[in-house]
Amino acid sequence: MVDFHKAGEYQYISISPTAQVELGQDVTLRSFVCLEVGSEATFKLGNRVFFNNHCSIRCEHHIEIGKDTMFGDGVRIFDHNHQYSNYHIEKISFNKGPVIIGKNCWIGSNVVILKGVTIGDNVIIGAGAVIHKDIPSNSIVVSKEELVIKERPQ
């Protein structure tokens, strides 16, 4: 069994016996965290990584997270997605790409990090952003989506 420094309630942790896993010291998982590491995957966590409530990490290929990185509520990390094809769903496989997150990062609530992304060191990502391309070190990322407000017809 994987031993975490601090663990909240009701986690779902599924790590294949053939996965390559490295955990740093003082890793904290709050409540309702989901961690899945597949059979051919590599998953590495640095020291003092903190996952707040309701985070989900799905590793089928390679996810690496540097030391002293914090994740807000509801963060999702995926190193794979479904491959689109016209086949029946049971025949569809995954497209995979590594996710590398540097050290000393702060990932805000409800951020989604997609496959094939490298996030440098000392990065802050604001709440609700969808990260689908690389972020250089020492950056601040905010999701700037316009709010469309229309009058409701009577």
Per-range role (PLM):
Residues E64, Y84-N86, T118:
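Conserved SAM-binding loop
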